[in-house]
Amino acid sequence: MSKQTFSTTFAGKPLVVEVGQVAKQANGATVVRYGESTVLTAAVMSKKMATGDFFPLQVNYEEKMYAAGKFPGGFMKREGRPSTDATLTARLIDRPIRPMFAEGFRNEIQVINTVLSYDENASAPMAAMFGSSLALSISDIPFNGPIAGVQVGYIDGEFIINPDKAQMEASLLELTVAGSKEAINMVESGAKELSEDIMLEALLKGHQAIQELIAFQEEIVAAVGKEKAEVELLQVDADLQAEIVAKYNADLQKAVQVEEKKAREAATEAVKETVKAEYEAKFAEDENLATIMRDVAEILEQMEHAEVRRLITEDKVRPDGRKVDEIRPLDAQIDFLPKVHGSGLFTRGQTQALSVLTLAPMGDTQIIDGLDDEYKKRFLHHYNFPQYSVGETGRYGAAGRREIGHGALGERALEQVLPSLEEFPYAIRLVAEVLESNGSSSQASICAGTLALMAGGVPIKAPVAGIAMGLISDGTNYTVLTDIQGLEDHFGDMDFKVAGTRDGITALQMDIKIEGITPQILEEALAQAKKARFEILDLIETTIPAPRPELAPTAPKIDTIQIDVDKIKIVIGKGGETIDKIIAETGVKIDIDEEGLVQIFSSDQAAIDRTKEIITSLVREAKVGEVYHAKVVRIEKFGAFVNLFDKTDALVHISEIAWTRTANVSDVLEVGEEVDVKVIKVDDKGRVDASMKALIPRPPKPEKKEEKASEAKEASNDQASKSQSETASEEK
């Protein structure tokens, strides 16, 4: 195929698609140019069905630093493991694509997005999502697309599609929504306490824009799309399925209805093991034993899947006996751990999360150096999911994509209520340890995080709670579930997480296993989630009504000093010598920003006070009118130099020593002598003039002879008048 180009304008920016020029050995490849962002997407499919009981789809989003004209950091100066943002973007693309493959599809699929040039005002992630769908759609890979995605902002009551960087910074909403022409199938959002009505409207506005992008894709597919390949789907033997269902469905139905998770798992596993043992013995000599046993396992999974869904949709009975809108038993506790800066333990049924707060100086913030300009990240929310939380053994190591994604969701939910840097000048880290899990552990970590922040004295604007909503749909009828547990998540059609305060939503995340959901379902799920969120907030506010007024004793205390920008070098010293000495003496941490704001951190208030003393003296300036007790350090013919404080000297000119004439400075002053002086001038170069005589009362001026004679005569006359008056009085 020769190169073909297609172009349109979307959200005020040119959108250009090129096919047929690069990556021609992939099943499908596109170059998408949106604004000045350029993304190459290549989609590849394996020749044969992969082994395993899952669909092996891999989506990568690779940030090349040259795309932004930057050198990679680190010693190797080469791109390494994906950044957190790249990992989250890969998940963002994976989630709407995955439901668009046929049930039973098991061929391995790789979709690789490479950012070749980067424009901060034209979303490269949205270009990559568009390119991923289009590369699959024009290829011979069986894909039930296309899909597309957009970002939605909300400024001054108006919705903005794919806002630029400045608009996103001003926006009350940061929403990514994806879907097909018919329906939405993925949502990811952070919001500044927006109402359910505004969020729903934003989703619908986003879907309208998505339809425009899908129409453009369909035009391209019609022009250059390949015929789809015939691919083997995983299908079980129909006769074998009918036999197992007839013999064991009643037993499995009974096992599924055991309310307690562990007991239910044991009961269902016992039925499955019985069936597997029977058929393994029955077909022990059959050369297709492996295929038969794979079918047996798949049939049992389908039977459990069907029974859980039937119970909910027909009998309105959930596996643990709850109503469809009922939350599991709740419990909340603060101060679970001593010594730490704050901790909260939140339990909902068999899901439990411990959140631990750590406060630190702003110098400990994470520096993010990706395709955007380098910036400091003040708030971190990390999520850990150990295998013991579900009673299993498994891999331990660095956080995987799921843990990174769940941590980011909690971060978005809680970030909206954090105090500003001016109100609370700390770097903040929350770590969520999932101790027990039976569904919706990410939302439990948000609730535990709220408890830890409030217990630690972080003045958040309002407590945040999260809840996960589920859906069981047969295409015609549907049931929305509140607070889904693991089994309902596994066999259900939707995982819709909603977090927020009493005033509004702060985060959304939705993933579905069907091709899309309607606005009616979204509206119902949001309303049901609000009711559940308020119930959880009642518990949180009962546990701790408001953030504590003080930090934990172990938390670092902070004090600040504002110094002139030109004094920063004095505090730091040559090669950091001065500041290092201060830190060595006091044991504090010191941060100085570009504006001259000095932040001092320590758990010891005395150390903070001493540090303030030292820094204040270093940057202190003599001011006109101030009086100092100074020491004479040098004597010259024209005057004496005195030390006012630290490295600040002043000149006392010979004429400023006394009101009477001073013949020789050395006759009056000597080196080492201490005197009081008053600053009378500071020039533009910082040179200080001081005066001793300004602190001495000025003696009266000498009087002239004529004035003295006149004054004497007047005094004599007054005295005579007084004597005459007294004589007259006596005679009377």
UniProtKB/Swiss-Prot annotation:
Organism: Streptococcus uberis (strain ATCC BAA-854 / 0140J)
GO cellular component labels: cytosol
HAMAP family found in the cross-reference section: PNPase
Co-factor requirement: Mg(2+)
Protein name: Polyribonucleotide nucleotidyltransferase
Cellular localisation: Cytoplasm
Biological role: Involved in mRNA degradation. Catalyzes the phosphorolysis of single-stranded polyribonucleotides processively in the 3'- to 5'-direction.
SUPFAM superfamilies, per database record: Eukaryotic type KH-domain (KH-domain type I), Nucleic acid-binding proteins, Polynucleotide phosphorylase/guanosine pentaphosphate synthase (PNPase/GPSI), domain 3, Ribonuclease PH domain 2-like, Ribosomal protein S5 domain 2-like
Compositionally biased region (Basic and acidic residues): 700-716
GO molecular function: 3'-5'-RNA exonuclease activity; magnesium ion binding; polyribonucleotide nucleotidyltransferase activity; RNA binding
EC number(s) on file: 2.7.7.8
Composition skew (Polar residues), residue ranges: 717-732
Residues annotated as binding Mg(2+): D489, D495
